[in-house]
Each structure stands twice: as C-alpha cells, then as structure tokens.
Amino acid sequence: MKLHRTTLAFAVAAALALPPAVMAQQPAPKPESKQGQNKGGLAQGDRKFVMEAAHGNMAEVELGKLAADKGASDAVKQFGKRMTDDHGKANGELKDFAEKKGLTLPADLDAKHKQLRDRLAKLNGADFDRAYANEMVKDHKKDVADFKREAKGAKDPDLKAWASKTLPTLEDHLKQAQDMQAQLKSAPRAAR
C-alpha cells in the first residue's frame, strides 16, 4: 500500500509539472495578423493599385511629352499635352496619399513602360501618331477598368474617394483617345 501511495504521489507531481514544461516547448501564439497590410495599414490590393497607378501616371506623363514633341497631328500634340498635365496632377495627388500611408512611390518607369517609351521614340510622323493613339486607347481601357474596380472595392476610404474622383477624367481621356484613334485611321497614309 505504501508503494501505491508513493506511485500516486509521484504521478500527481509529474502531472502538475508536465503542463508548464509542455507549454514552454510550444511557440507563443502569434498576434492576429493584418494580412495584406503594410506599416501604413494599407491592404495589399490597395497597395498594388497605388503602385500600378503611379507607374501608369509616370508613363502617361513621359509618353505625353513624347507626343507633344514628336506628334505629326495637332490632335496628338494636344492630347499629349493634356496627358502630361492631367497625369502629372494625378501623380502629385497620389504622392500625397502615399506619404500619408507610409508608402514610397517608384521614382522611375517600370520595365514595361520603358520598353513602350523606347519603342514609340523610334517612330516618326503618322506612324508615331497611330502607335501612340493605339497605346492610349489600350492603356486607358485598362485604367478605367482598374479605377472602377478600386472606386467600388478599395479597402481604404481615402483611396476609394481618390479613385472615384479620378475616374471621370480617365473616362474622358479614353473617349478622346478613341476619337483620336478613329481620326488617324481615317486619315490617308503618306505615300511610301
């Protein structure tokens, strides 16, 4: 009987000592993560949109300058000037937003837009005008779709408001680009 009590006492002591030892081996529970957040609290999807918008705005400014300089038609030159002005303004607003959220915007074009700029820079006259108009239609269709999606689904209310405010300008750019594209398609090609 004495052996039974000793065994029982040992078992109780072991049972009481075991939980702290097991707990010490388990990793501490992680605090609830804010998945997709950065230090400024911006959701990953919103952050991606901001970066893409910044690259797009920079590209529109650079390509607009190129169009204002190289464009053969007045329509292309004027559209290029508008792109420089409107997208320069939009990028300034986006920069202010990014600073408030602790984001650093890119300082230069991404590879895709550099390649586009370099390709267009090699063209002249009507060839440049048509290629530029085609790119502006393609880019603004994508921009309008992206801004509509962000105006409805952005997690950040300030970003949602900015996307909503900017969307009508982009829709107008798309309409103007389509008109310019149609005008250039109907213009006679120069003799080769």
Show which residues each predicted segment covers:
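His/Met- and acidic-residue-enriched segments that coordinate or traffic transition-metal cofactors
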Residues: 2-192
